[in-house]
Amino acid sequence: MGSSKSKPKDPSQRRRSLEPPDSTHHGGFPASQTPDETAAPDAHRNPSRSFGTVATEPKLFWGFNTSDTVTSPQRAGALAGGVTTFVALYDYESWTETDLSFKKGERLQIVNNTEGDWWLAHSLTTGQTGYIPSNYVAPSDSIQAEEWYFGKITRRESERLLLNPENPRGTFLVRKSETAKGAYCLSVSDFDNAKGPNVKHYKICKLYSGGFYITSRTQFGSLQQLVAYYSKHADGLCHRLTNVCPTSKPQTQGLAKDAWEIPRESLRLEAKLGQGCFGEVWMGTWNGTTRVAIKTLKPGTMSPEAFLQEAQVMKKLRHEKLVQLYAVVSEEPIYIVIEYMSKGSLLDFLKGEMGKYLRLPQLVDMAAQIASGMAYVERMNYVHRDLRAANILVGENLVCKVADFGLARLIEDNEYTARQGAKFPIKWTAPEAALYGRFTIKSDVWSFGILLTELTTKGRVPYPGMVNREVLDQVERAYRMPCPPECPESLHDLMCQCWRKDPEERPTFKYLQAQLLPACVLEVAE
């Protein structure tokens, strides 16, 4: 394996304290002015396709529509209206000779932005030219360039970020409103003895004249002025604004420009993370600079030609809840290079030390994240085929991402393709898929119901005490797993909806995502 050139880069957090302001209150909200706390479903922010429009024969990760892809965080702006000068949102250290290193705050002249996710840029600070990741920059003097602006993140995602125990009261961010077109929302961390840590959401309204306000008696010419004012005065907010919400650097879209089929020597395997029937997973580095996870497949697991064809499509699927495919070594033994998720598989995480401290609200949130990723798969008219906790990866702050999408179809092992062989995941597979090979997004919904039992039981194997053949027989006779201990009936009811015999009667992932709001699931448990 290639030798290491430098210390691997780990995603760093950015945190900025605002000037210690005068905390004097200047009045409160009028009687009609209250925080915007209307519950909004954690629906995906791109237009979704109703199930009725899905083709009758969905292709597995094929024929995608790139206009429905998502990158996260959504900060970089397009070159619109002649804007060519951008500002760096994060530090970036070049990974290849053609990359351009830059520091946060550096101004960059964009030379060419027509080649996808890596733009050719010229630094106005260093005078050097090279390729930069487009999601690391934003147009100069734009709202996207503000550290506190988080764009199109959901209410739930803002709460996940703000409720980090390290954040002091008054930590905040500004995001686009999910419910009011053209409006923004100010989300602020708070604490009180009754609720404990919580987040308040305030709608920022826009004036016809172009100004902004939270309460109409105090208006501002820009969002920047609004943030500066409330950093000094609570003036009706739960607390004055203190710290910008920290966030990690986003993943770049790919390892570098044109880094797709890479030489095996550019990868260094450093620590074995796991082993399965078809290969191993390693933590490693690419090019001596970049932390990655590497899946190594045993020779004969799948056709290199079929894998490469499928991987060309899979790499273009982008959603914040799907693990990103970075690069491949296409000659056997096949290597699959993906983004590194620090906490490993969800199954191991649930069964490990950290799993003991997970409570129902956190488990429901993890389920909602998985449903969000699968709702994207659903919209794109694809099928996962092997959805279970072992194929979900966990990162910092309990972030969950769906992995291994599409690979199950390519496996050539007889013990797997026989569908009832020792390696086939019978206990997670819908009966029509296990018995007749009918894999659809609805069979993925069945698997998601099984995954919910893994979450609520902290990684227990489904159908305890039953062997695979018995599971198939019992399920065909209408047996369904009972409600797990300490699981609310409302959540078990959602599982049972996923396990309806008729695939067309099972819910969509879009519906499941909306139902997995803590308030919907927890009211019975509490």
From Swiss-Prot:
Q: How is it modified after translation?
A: The phosphorylated form is termed pp60v-src.
Q: Which residues form the Protein kinase domain?
A: 267-517
Q: Which residues carry this modification: Phosphotyrosine?
A: Y416
Name the cofactor(s) required for activity, per the record: Mn(2+)
Tell me the keywords, alphabetical order: ATP-binding, Kinase, Lipoprotein, Manganese, Metal-binding, Myristate, Nucleotide-binding, Phosphoprotein, SH2 domain, SH3 domain, Transferase, Tyrosine-protein kinase
- Ranges for domain SH2 come to 148-245
Provide the reaction this enzyme catalyses.
L-tyrosyl-[protein] + ATP = O-phospho-L-tyrosyl-[protein] + ADP + H(+)
EC annotation?
2.7.10.2
Q: Where are the transmembrane segments?
A: none
UniProt cross-references to Pfam families, sorted A to Z: PK_Tyr_Ser-Thr (PF07714), SH2 (PF00017), SH3_1 (PF00018)
| Gene Ontology MF: a single term | non-membrane spanning protein tyrosine kinase activity
The family annotation for this protein states: Belongs to the protein kinase superfamily. Tyr protein kinase family. SRC subfamily.
Record-given protein name: Tyrosine-protein kinase transforming protein Src
The protein's organism comes out as Rous sarcoma virus (strain H-19)
